[in-house]
Amino acid sequence: MNIKQAKEEIKHTVTAYLKKDDEGRYKIPLIRQRPVLLMGPPGIGKTQIMEQIAEECKIGLVAYTITHHTRQSAVGLPFIKEMEFAGKEYSITEYTMSEIIASVYRKIEEGCPEGILFIDEINCVSETLAPTMLQFLQCKTFGNQAVPEGWIIVAAGNPPEYNKSVREFDMVTLDRVRCMQVEACLLYTSPSPRD
């Protein structure tokens, strides 16, 4: 499909996921919403269509290029907490809120209770962040914080022929997302004139 068709498909998906019943509950609960995975060459407008969809649907958009992040900014920073188990005191590791999830909550506080969480270059992450991204797509969480209800996950990546650092997703992950393959639209291009 081309980028225009992808935009319409994603817009349709967002609209369906945000429909509510008479009691104000989402008709498709968060647990049943499959993240959208948009795969296509760089520079075809994947990020731009997310901005357009958010504007047209009058919802928020939080966009991150995940290759600029570390495991700590995605999952949160570790800290030690004392807890008691079976009458004995233990030091355990907990995590602060993910920078990405915190950005969604900031957007909610700004008046956008619904929106799109867009993660770009999801299949180009470092080796240490790859398991976190798989967990994100499968469980809709970063660390121990879930994506809030009303926020739709859309991720984008590039095929391996465009980026040598691409990591392939396993079949289990691909089974849990709605994958769209987008090709460059050559409608407005013409061969360059030769002298």
What do these predicted ranges mean?
Residues 59-83:
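AAA+/P-loop NTPase substrate/partner-engagement loops
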Residues 167-184:
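A short helix-turn-beta junction within AAA+ P-loop NTPase domains corresponding to the substrate/partner-engaging
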Residues 84-116:
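Conserved alpha-helical scaffold flanking the Walker A/P-loop in AAA+ ATPase domains
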Residues 95-96, 105-107, 112, 143-158, ...:
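AAA+/SF3 P-loop NTPase mechanochemical coupling elements
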Residues 32-68:
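Walker A/P-loop
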Residues 2-34:
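Pre-Walker A (pre-P-loop) alpha-helix and adjacent loop at the N terminus of AAA/AAA+ ATPase modules
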Residues 128-146:
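Conserved catalytic/switch belt of AAA+ P-loop NTPases
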Residues 188-195:
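Conserved small/polar residues in nucleotide/adenosyl-binding loops
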